[in-house]
From Swiss-Prot:
Protein family per UniProt: Belongs to the DarP family.
One Pfam family per UniProt: DarP
GO molecular function, one term: rRNA binding
Location of this chain's protein in the cell: Cytoplasm
Major location (coarse): cytoplasm
Protein name: Dual-action ribosomal maturation protein DarP
InterPro entries the record matches: DarP, DarP_sf
Superkingdom of origin organism: Bacteria
HAMAP family, sorted: DarP
A Gene Ontology biological process term: assembly of large subunit precursor of preribosome
Length: 183
């Protein structure tokens, strides 16, 4: 008996394609382009970082070399190098790189907020005097009360005499040192 044309398809080995676990996920060409563009922007952010900041980001040697080369290149060559960096990033897990970059950006924002708080505290020290000194001593018990009072007194004299705020800057520096030594 000869097989019918439909019957010969049933005997093909590996004919268990109907497995529902192997779903094919279709990704649009536009989405692929958006992802590539996003990785190119990430690469540009990495190129804009300084050497010290780059040291804090987990990069392998060839990606690091490509970034350092892009930092030295100007104009059209830089654009092509950024495209290469984007291509290299597509072949890697970029999540650790993104997390390290976010951490760097967040650290900068936290530092700006801290500086604003210290400036406000410095201004209160100059205006309020001993009441604000007590607050500083509760925040940082190891602070030198005598040095603070001397700096405050000098800052008030400079302010009254319309002189440059040298002592006010010194108060800020001292408060910043206290905050850095604490953390």
């Amino acid at each position: 008996m000869t097989k019918q044309p439909e019957d010969w398809l049933d005997d093909v080995p590996g004919d268990d394609i109907e497995d529902e676990d192997d779903e094919i996920i279709w990704v649009s060409k536009s989405e692929i382009k958006r992802d590539a563009e996003e990785l190119k922007r990430l690469g540009a952010e990495l190129v804009d970082l300084g050497k010290n900041a780059l040291d804090k980001i987990p990069l392998d040697a060839d990606l690091r070399d490509a970034i350092e080369l892009a930092q030295r290149i100007k104009m059209e060559g830089r654009r092509r190098q950024l495209q290469l960096i984007g291509k290299m990033l597509r072949q890697r897990d970029v999540e650790p790189i993104r997390q390290a970059l976010d951490k760097l950006k967040n650290r900068h924002n936290q530092q700006v907020v801290l500086f604003h708080k210290l400036e406000h505290l410095r201004d209160r020290l100059i205006v309020e005097g001993d009441d604000a000194v007590v607050e500083v001593l509760t925040l940082w018990p190891h602070a030198d009360r005598q040095q603070l009072r001397s700096l405050i007194r000098n800052a008030k004299k400079e302010k009254e005499g319309n002189k440059p705020p040298k002592s006010a800057r010194q108060i800020f520096q001292y408060l910043r040192e206290l905050a850095e030594n604490e953390g």
